[in-house]
Amino acid sequence: MGAIITLSILALVVLYLGLFKAKALLLPVSILGFLVAIGFLLNDWTADKGPLFSGMVHFDHYAIAFSVLCIVVTLCIFIISKGYFDEGGQVAEYYSLLIFSLTGAVLVNSYHNFSMLFLGIEIMSVALYILVGIRKRDKASNEAALKYFLMGAFSTGFLLFGIALLYGATGSFDLDEIKAYVVNNPHAISPLFYGGILLLIVGLTFKVGAAPFHFWTPDVYDGAPILITSYMSTVVKVASFAGLLRLFSYSLLPLQDFWEPVFLIIAIITLFIGKIGRAHV
């Protein structure tokens, strides 16, 4: 949990550094904050305290590994893109919004309750809606931001509807209780539950960019600033996959025979469309 708090404070500190024109401190302070967050995560690796805050988040080895990966990739993007940042006049805003988005990614990696999954995805996405369209005079950037916002809202609707159906069937947002429902009722699972699983797959594969829910990615990646595209194609996808895997490899693992063919079809379609539909090499 220390990593989430550190990143949240870091985003605010960076924003205030920009307010006071301390541009030279932005990168060093960001790097220091990232290292502190990684330190908290590595400390949690040897001291697993179980689900925290009434089961809202759980920093197990799975969450820590994906969170460290997200932070390291973001750190590399910051270092490599220093010259890119210096060219613009909104340096602090770039840094701060990316760190806020990273905070959401860490939440998605470590959620143990559907409310935290939703909160993490929204924190991660809302910052990116702004960053994709941050070039106000660039029509391609504005178009990409609008498409990303509309598709993001569309996918969030599927995600929330799926969560609502699972809650209606189980009476809980907690992953442990959802798993207990599946284990204890192998032959009496509500049809609502199966419908909720399918809607969750749709909502989460939108975030991952898997076919046939990938149609927003070419325009958004092409119109967004290259730095933001780099972040979206790495950190956002890692966090989205982590959130997807946590749910289906833990709570819904007993229903593998139901959802495995769905993912197999999605994987085949994604590989097929990606192979024959590419326009740029």
Go through the PLM ranges and name each one.
Residues M1-H280:
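Alpha-helical transmembrane segments of multi-pass membrane proteins predominantly involved
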